[in-house]
Design a protein with these regions (language model features):
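Domain-level signature for soluble enzymes in the chorismate/prephenate branch of the shikimate pathway
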Residues: 1-270
Length: 270
């Protein structure tokens, strides 16, 4: 039972993977799509993917992959994120000219980076990849925004810590599988909908959930590239597929919407 994550050792995805699967063989890959493909081709049982951050919002690439890939969410995990500024041994804050990190991490630390407006910001694939680059380049003018674990793994000094603008900074990770695993304990259901382009349609569709006593946890829209200013909706609700009001809503949606995909029925892991 292998588990795969995107990035390198020290990445936040790696931290979550080790928390959820401490005794399982893990593998790291370069991109989110690579991670999902490892699951689809049978090389891994699960992959761990970040889907949303409480400060910077959704990871849009992941939402697009959930649409086109035949995987389901089987669990979610919220990780409190505290970013550190990491430099080579002996570097000081005054030495820094360039900061590397994942675009989401740069956004989460935007207020801190504004205070250091002279620094160049360069996006890389992953926070831990950024730490590894700083270690490999051995340049005191470079820093990475990453986890304290990345600093330990890549022998870097912590120049500053807790630099994210929101002290409650949290990233939601999902566990993806190609096996459609649904448990009677599952309490969250994720869907993708596309609606007819008609006036009041979104209002009517959301009303179906309310009338059936279902709590909408999240509604996120993404543009449909091939349809100008039309959107698909990613919806999270509280509920279980075995409940009559949930099955009733799904039957109504099948008749009313132009596209429906169940992304998973799952629980939060604490």
């Amino acid at each position: 039972k292998r588990v795969v994550y995107q990035g390198v050792e020290g990445a936040y995805s790696h931290i979550v993977t080790k928390k959820l699967f401490p005794d399982v063989e893990t593998e790291n890959v370069n991109t989110f799509e690579d991670a999902i493909n490892e699951v689809l081709n049978g090389n891994a049982k699960y992959c761990i993917i970040p889907i949303e951050n409480s400060s910077a919002g959704i990871v849009s690439d992941v939402y697009d992959l959930l649409l086109k890939k035949d995987v389901v969410i089987v669990a979610e995990y919220d990780l409190h994120i505290s970013h550190c500024l990491l430099g080579v041994r002996g570097a000081k804050l005054g030495d820094i000219k360039t900061v590397y990190s994942h675009p989401q991490a740069l956004m989460q630390c935007s207020a801190y980076l504004k205070e250091h407006s002279g620094w160049s910001q360069i996006s890389l694939l992953n926070t831990a990849v950024s730490a590894k680059k700083v270690r490999d380049d051995k340049d005191i003018s470079q820093a990475a925004i990453a986890s304290r674990l990345s600093g330990d793994l890549y022998d870097l000094d912590v120049l500053d810590e807790g630099i994210n603008r929101n002290a409650n900074n949290t990233t939601r990770f999902v566990v993806l599988s190609k096996d459609k695993i649904f448990s009677k304990k599952s309490n969250k259901l994720s869907l993708i909908l596309e609606l007819p382009h008609e006036k009041g349609m979104l209002y009517n569709i959301l009303g179906i959930f309310v009338l059936n006593g279902l709590n909408l946890v999240k509604v996120e829209s993404r543009p449909i590239p091939e349809k100008t200013f039309e959107y698909r909706f990613f919806i999270d609700i509280e509920g279980n597929l075995s409940l009559s009001n949930v099955s009733n809503v799904l039957e109504i949606l099948k008749k009313e919407v132009t596209f429906l995909k169940i992304l998973g029925n799952y629980c939060s892991v604490k």
